Amino acid sequence: MKKILALLVIAPLLVSCSGNKNQVENEVFVKDTNGFEILMGQFAHNIENIWGLKEVLIAGPKDYVKYTDQYQTRSHINFDAGTITIETIATTNPAAHLRQAIITTLLMGDDPGSIDLYSDVNDIQISKEPFLYGQVLDNNGEPIRWEWRAAHFADYLLQNKMQTRTSGLHVISFVTIQLVPNHLDKRAHKYLPLVRKSAARYGVEESLILAIMQTESSFNPYAVSRSDALGLMQVVQHTAGKDVFKLKGKSGQPSRSYLFDPENNIDAGTAYLSILQNTYLGGIQNATSRRYAVITSYNGGAGSVLRVFHSDKNKAVGIINTMSPGDVFQTLTTKHPSGESRRYLVKVNSAQKNYRRY
């Protein structure tokens, strides 16, 4: 019971990080990134106390994780791997716990503001247009929109696919559901109208926006990170968010609930790309070289990109303008001080090629 109480104390402070629009008062506390990281560490520690060593799962950029039943049951969607795992450590009638979690996960909507990822409250609203509609097929090969179909599929899974595994002192009951092979493409198409709207507004390539979204979140609207980046394009409130609000003539920075709205998030992420493209890196003459710099800057900042070439920003731009795009790419992917940023350029550039066909 003490383990549950510890989570009940921490969870309300993390509520605003999940985008819950009813908990705006908590945002002041978690605006400090260090405070957020401390709370996340405490949350992880308490999950470990309940589930055991090596069993900590927390929502991330490409992972939706929701706990229910006093943190004894959880739903995990791995958007990269294309799998849904519903599991429970409940010892009394585990199938019943799994059944409810399967149904609500299959039928949840795509509004992150309606779900608190850090509490154990089953606050998932069944949607008439489920977020996973078309991404999961039942045992008859049919997409799942209605509660009766989700319930039938849950019963089928529990009768035919339920498994158990042992972890520490727990026997964990679970089922695994595969997303359809083209699940990534289906999510991309879902947000295409919003992408096109923002691309036209800010003069940014649609394919670049989609590639950034894939790399940042795998089109997961519930995306969160320990670095305090939020939503589909993983916008950070106090850096990119501030720049975007300044561009719009607004003071301050966007709230978490604002950035968890898919339309706002895509708008903000695209606006920031336009700031990088037209302001911070606007002096780079070759469009391809500038695109490489913009992509890397979206991950690690424009200053760190320019310092790869020279400590003086103006001289750095001048040096870039004497180089071929291939040499710029080679330099950024081998000499940027951040390994993450080096890999990021490779990933986004590769993904963008696939989205040029849209």
Swiss-Prot record:
Enzyme Commission designation: 4.2.2.n1
Listed CDD domains: LT_MltC_MltE
Keyword Isomerase attached: no
Leader sequence residues: 1-16
Lipidation (S-diacylglycerol cysteine): C17
SUPFAM superfamilies: Lysozyme-like
Function statement: Murein-degrading enzyme. May play a role in recycling of muropeptides during cell elongation and/or cell division.
HAMAP family xref list: MltC (MF_01616)
Protein name, as recorded: Membrane-bound lytic murein transglycosylase C
Annotated organism of origin: Yersinia pestis
Lineage: Bacteria, Pseudomonadati, Pseudomonadota, Gammaproteobacteria, Enterobacterales
